[in-house]
């Protein structure tokens, strides 16, 4: 039977902290300023063990929690994790210990195994797009607004699949739409923040479609908020992927075979195959060289980022 004095929350940050806050609320500990002790970062094992040894004051339970216990992952001290694991049997019955970590825990570590055996472990994988969309709909209801599933999907596409981002964007959109109003797709397109990945996708699409003016306008907007190095890196990744697909197509490989070789799904491979059709393998190789030169020029300050990126992108896309 699980020990309800031991909790481990791991994975996606929003859900981890939500679970911790729900635990704190459910315990309803008296005099929390004395009986609840929280560590934002991981203390050493001795300090944590000492905190756990304390007795509650005028309360049934005492809560000790760590919001970023890195010893549960490959980043933190395995020795500290082992030391705490060996002490769990000696925790007072009045102490509730909750450990949180962002990302997947290292299940090989003794501490994880002990929590899995003795306590309650909850793991939260990164959300999928449909889960983020459903979350957006619920957040809109909390704000007194209405948001359809379809429009929520548009929001996730533009802003990214991240609970914190979606929560903030829905709050902003609810204010923009007005009390009790429905958040429309047009509201989302006008107000929602775009992820860098989405902006790169839009830039790439405009350049593939030979819309030089539209691409230049969007590039100027993106460079107002993003570092140019990040854009260059994502364009380099796009052209590396096109180069790989083009090379395999030239060898006679089919879409399914390419997807298996590159460990990608078939649909992205089909898109890449369509996009690289107008380029030769040699052109794509030369584009990667030009992007490397652009990266150096921007990082070294040799050239103005807007001018250098515009010239390079128009050249490598053949405009």
Residue positions per predicted region:
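Conserved beta/loop motifs at nucleotide-recognition and modification sites
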Residues: 1-319
């Amino acid at each position: 039977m699980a020990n309800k004095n031991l909790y481990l929350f791991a994975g996606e940050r929003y859900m981890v902290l939500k679970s911790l806050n729900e635990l704190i609320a459910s315990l309803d500990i008296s005099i929390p300023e004395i009986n609840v002790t929280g560590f934002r970062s991981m203390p050493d094992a001795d300090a944590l063990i000492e905190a756990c040894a304390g007795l509650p004051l005028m309360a049934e339970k005492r809560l000790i929690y760590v919001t970023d216990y890195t010893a549960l992952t490959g980043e933190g001290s395995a020795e500290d994790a082992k030391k705490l694991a060996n002490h769990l049997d000696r925790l007072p019955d009045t102490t509730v210990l909750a450990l949180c970590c962002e990302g997947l825990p290292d299940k090989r570590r003794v501490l994880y195994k002990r929590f899995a055996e003795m306590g309650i472990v909850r793991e939260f994988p990164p959300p999928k797009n449909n889960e983020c969309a459903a979350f957006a709909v619920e957040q809109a209801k909390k704000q007194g607004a209405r948001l359809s599933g379809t429009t929520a999907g548009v929001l996730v596409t533009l802003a990214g699949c991240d609970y914190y981002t979606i929560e903030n964007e829905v709050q902003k959109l609810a204010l923009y739409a007005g009390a009790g109003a429905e958040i429309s797709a047009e509201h989302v397109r006008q107000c929602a923040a775009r992820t860098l990945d989405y902006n790169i996708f839009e830039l790439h699409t405009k350049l593939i479609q030979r819309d030089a003016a539209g691409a230049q306008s969007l590039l100027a907007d993106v460079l107002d908020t993003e570092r140019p190095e990040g854009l260059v890196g994502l364009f380099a990744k796009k052209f590396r992927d096109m180069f790989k697909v083009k090379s395999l197509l030239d060898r006679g490989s089919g879409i399914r075979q390419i997807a298996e070789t590159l460990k990608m799904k078939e649909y992205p491979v089909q898109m890449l195959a369509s996009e690289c059709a107008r380029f030769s393998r040699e052109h794509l190789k030369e584009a990667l060289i030009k992007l490397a030169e652009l990266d150096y020029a921007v990082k070294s300050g040799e050239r103005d980022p807007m001018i250098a990126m515009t010239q390079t992108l128009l050249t490598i896309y053949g405009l």
